[in-house]
Amino acid sequence: MLEAKNILVGITGGIAAYKTVFLVRLLKKAGANVKVVLTQNASTFVSPLTLATLSENPVGIDFTEISEGSLSWNNHVELGLWADYMIIAPATAHTLSKMANGQADNLLLVTYLSAKCPVLIAPAMDLDMFKHPSTKTNLNTLSKNGHAIIPVGNGLLASGLSGEGRMAEPEEILEFLINYHKIFSYI
């Protein structure tokens, strides 16, 4: 279903980032071409090397990187144009706020603002953060902007609390993307 589709995965700095490693693997198994952009904070939760290996592409973290002894520029516009779909998973409350307000202070956010493709967002945060009116406002804004919000799960959270806020499981995100693609590829 996703054969030769270009999927750009954006990973933000939340504990649920570990799930996104498996999502990258599932996307590749489904036949997609995958590129990954991490926030600096996300790189403390998941290894860029692991993601580069699984995606079979270099991972973007910053606007510039040192590769093979020279400095190269990560072109966010090219990344945004390359993608058929962009999935941001996990999307923390911090990043949701920045996205809803058009802030562009890291590679992931400037790529998001440059993307011409559908954007799918998988929120992940603690129960109280998820239920906060500011978070609901940001999610509503992003939804009104045409982005697909992947429903959060309900269960045990990293904080020890139980409730809404868990990032959807990788299989659920893949299924959401496939269904989204089926619906909107005919329009």
Regions found by a protein language model. Give the residues of each.
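A cross-family phosphate/adenosyl-ligand binding-site feature
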Residues: 1-120, 127-187
